């Protein structure tokens, strides 16, 4: 009779620890780019909607990821990823 192979892969962190670490990283980054009262209100909204649940945790992670992505994409001045409109010369060319 065949037996299932023993787990020989690398040790992995439990999923909940990893999720909490991701949330902490997102919070640190969000505080650098958004007003604290605004983030506090977002957290209150999530807590009111989901309570103290894993669904609430997943929701706040998803929302913070989306907000930070959009913020960087439209041109955060703290980042090199954003779209910064280039100035054009009088004739419309970008040559010097």
Curated annotation (Swiss-Prot):
Q: Where in the cell is it found?
A: Virion; Host nucleus; Host extracellular space
Major subcellular site: virion
Q: Work out whether the entry's keyword set contains Transcription.
A: yes
Q: Does the keyword Transcription apply?
A: yes
Region annotation (Homooligomerization) ranges: 1-42
In this UniProt entry, the residues modified to Phosphoserine are: 79, 94, 96
GO CC annotation, single = virion component
Q: Describe the PTM.
A: Phosphorylated on several residues by host. These phosphorylations regulate VPR activity for the nuclear import of the HIV-1 pre-integration complex.
Q: Which Gene3D superfamilies match?
A: 6.10.210.10, VpR/VpX protein, C-terminal domain (1.20.5.90)
What GO terms in the biological process aspect are recorded for it? Answer: DNA-templated transcription; monoatomic ion transmembrane transport; protein homooligomerization; regulation of DNA-templated transcription; symbiont entry into host cell; symbiont-mediated activation of host apoptosis; symbiont-mediated arrest of host cell cycle during G2/M transition; viral penetration into host nucleus
UniProt keywords (A-Z) are:
Activator, AIDS, Apoptosis, Cell cycle, Host G2/M cell cycle arrest by virus, Host nucleus, Host-virus interaction, Ion channel, Ion transport, Modulation of host cell cycle by virus, Phosphoprotein, Transcription, Transcription regulation, Transport, Viral penetration into host nucleus, Virion, Virus entry into host cell
Under InterPro entries, the record lists: RetroV_VpR/X
Q: What else is known?
A: HIV-1 lineages are divided in three main groups, M (for Major), O (for Outlier), and N (for New, or Non-M, Non-O). The vast majority of strains found worldwide belong to the group M. Group O seems to be endemic to and largely confined to Cameroon and neighboring countries in West Central Africa, where these viruses represent a small minority of HIV-1 strains. The group N is represented by a limited number of isolates from Cameroonian persons. The group M is further subdivided in 9 clades or subtypes (A to D, F to H, J and K).
Its quaternary organisation is:
Homooligomer, may form homodimer. Interacts with p6-gag region of the Pr55 Gag precursor protein through a (Leu-X-X)4 motif near the C-terminus of the P6gag protein. Interacts with host UNG. May interact with host RAD23A/HHR23A. Interacts with host VPRBP/DCAF1, leading to hijack the CUL4A-RBX1-DDB1-DCAF1/VPRBP complex, mediating ubiquitination of host proteins such as TERT and ZGPAT and arrest of the cell cycle in G2 phase.
| Protein family per UniProt | Belongs to the HIV-1 VPR protein family.
Q: Which HAMAP family match?
A: HIV_VPR (MF_04080)
Function comment: During virus replication, may deplete host UNG protein, and incude G2-M cell cycle arrest. Acts by targeting specific host proteins for degradation by the 26S proteasome, through association with the cellular CUL4A-DDB1 E3 ligase complex by direct interaction with host VPRPB/DCAF-1. Cell cycle arrest reportedly occurs within hours of infection and is not blocked by antiviral agents, suggesting that it is initiated by the VPR carried into the virion. Additionally, VPR induces apoptosis in a cell cycle dependent manner suggesting that these two effects are mechanistically linked. During virus entry, plays a role in the transport of the viral pre-integration (PIC) complex to the host nucleus. This function is crucial for viral infection of non-dividing macrophages. May act directly at the nuclear pore complex, by binding nucleoporins phenylalanine-glycine (FG)-repeat regions.
The name of this protein is Protein Vpr
Q: Which organism is it from?
A: Human immunodeficiency virus type 1 group M subtype K (isolate 96CM-MP535) (HIV-1)
The uppermost taxa in this organism's lineage are: Viruses, Riboviria, Pararnavirae, Artverviricota, Revtraviricetes
Q: Which gene encodes it?
A: vpr
């Amino acid at each position: 009779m065949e037996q299932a192979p023993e787990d020989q892969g690398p040790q992995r962190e439990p999923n909940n620890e990893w999720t909490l670490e991701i949330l902490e990283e997102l919070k640190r980054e969000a505080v650098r780019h958004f007003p604290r009262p605004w983030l506090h209100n977002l957290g209150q909204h999530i807590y009111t909607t989901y309570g103290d649940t894993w669904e609430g945790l997943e929701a706040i992670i998803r929302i913070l990821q989306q907000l930070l992505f959009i913020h960087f994409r439209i041109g955060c001045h703290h980042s090199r990823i954003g779209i910064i409109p280039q100035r054009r010369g009088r004739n419309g060319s970008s040559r010097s």
